[in-house]
Amino acid sequence: MVTGMIIKKIKELTKEEEEKIINRNKANFEEILPTVMEILKDVKEKGDEALKYYTKKFDGVEIEDFKVTDEEIEEAYNSVDYKVVEAIERAKENIYFFHKKQMEQIKDLNVENNGIILGQVVRAIEKVGCYVPGGRAFYPSTVLMTTIPAKVAGCEEIYITSPPTKDGKGNPATLIAGDIVGVSAIYKVGGVQAIGALAYGTETIPKVDIIVGPGNIYVTTAKKMVYGEVAIDFLAGPSEVLIIADETANAEFVALDFIAQAEHDPNASCVITTTSEKKAEEIKNKIFEEIEKAERKEIILKALENSAILIGDLEECIEFSNKYAPEHLEILTKNPEEVLNKIKHAGSVFLGEYSPVPVGDYASGTNHVLPTSQFARMSSGLNVETFLKKITYQKLDKESLKNIADIVITLAEAEGLFGHAEAVRRRLK
């Protein structure tokens, strides 16, 4: 049963073993690129006709009108348990709270330096496309996570695309979440064709300025290929967690959090680093106890191939975590805040035994759209700044222009741009 799962001391890992763990799930875009490019080309050239063709081909349903109607939304409310609606409402409040606090930290700037007025103004991106996955499951939580930061940022138009259900409708909980946030429109289209529609525009779906949201490798590849036509958030892959656990950690909680991540996807990656060999053995045993009871057992067993339990002192665990740059990082130690101070790379961090990853997935208020596959080394998770631009400005009078004219003229002429130099020189005559 333990086949494929590495259990070893960190300092005894071979180079190949360490690379296998750290370089997890590197997407092979090249294999599927021809398929993705063909679909994108068709959507660009044929618009809604291509959307209908690929929706029938991949989703098995014929759809004439992709835009969700008010009647469909009303029907969704009638088909969903009120507890789900209430949970969406409460999650929305927490997510709004945190992202509004983020927004409060982002301010315009106006300063003076040697008589020059310098500044920046913050402006929202106008049109946003939010991709919400479907297929194995539907994710109303992703509706909240992608649309609320855009709302808080002040984006004028926010559109959702999400795959249709087998009866050609939108998933009820997804529709309700979009309605509760108050998006501009929801479209029943998924996959590469949805990304193409948002990037290029069709008769039904407007072209946007930025596309955000997670998806499978086809969706991710499509986002990669339309970047430049539109902005994107980042390229996200299968879900992942790294847990730092010392001897005080509750082995059952560690095992449950491992299972919670592994059940997402057979390609999910789960790594536990612990300071105690005894704790490592205890955690391993608890994991396999929980697997026997799990509903998504086959998926979890497959995910074990991307998993490891590693043993080292606390500094080695922290160093390994920073190399790994996890999407989710749980710190289950005596003093988790002290460990956090040494963390350089992570999408989102969960401190202490009562802060499991699922709270961030749904309701704590932070965002669950996070960088994977080491992208946390250079990317932040989705946040209000994803949907903002900072426009700089400057204002000089004749005196302040005179103070820097020699710098501008000298550098412009050194670069052979004599028109640049003359634009300054003439103003000072």
From Swiss-Prot:
The GO annotation for biological process reads:
L-histidine biosynthetic process
Which residues does the entry assign to the active site, renumbered to this chain? 327 (proton acceptor), 328 (proton acceptor)
Q: Which Pfam families match?
A: Histidinol_dh (PF00815)
**A molecular-function term among this protein's GO annotations:** zinc ion binding
Catalyzed reaction equations? L-histidinol + 2 NAD(+) + H2O = L-histidine + 2 NADH + 3 H(+)
Binding of substrate occurs at 239, 261, 264, 328, 361, 415, 420
Q: Which UniProt keywords apply?
A: Amino-acid biosynthesis, Histidine biosynthesis, Metal-binding, NAD, Oxidoreductase, Zinc
Question: What cofactor requirement does the entry state?
Answer: Zn(2+)
Q: In which pathway does it act?
A: Amino-acid biosynthesis; L-histidine biosynthesis; L-histidine from 5-phospho-alpha-D-ribose 1-diphosphate: step 9/9
Family under the similarity heading: Belongs to the histidinol dehydrogenase family.
Q: What name is this protein filed under?
A: Histidinol dehydrogenase
Cofactor note, please? Answer: Binds 1 zinc ion per subunit.
Annotated NAD(+) binding lies at 131, 193, 216
Give the EC number.
Answer: 1.1.1.23
Taxonomy, superkingdom? Archaea
Origin organism is Methanocaldococcus jannaschii (strain ATCC 43067 / DSM 2661 / JAL-1 / JCM 10045 / NBRC 100440)
GO CC, alphabetical: cytoplasm
- Taken from the UniProt record, the cysteine pairs bridged by disulfide bonds within this chain are none
Role played? Catalyzes the sequential NAD-dependent oxidations of L-histidinol to L-histidinaldehyde and then to L-histidine.
Q: What class of enzyme is it?
A: oxidoreductase
**Binding locations of Zn(2+):** 261, 264, 361, 420
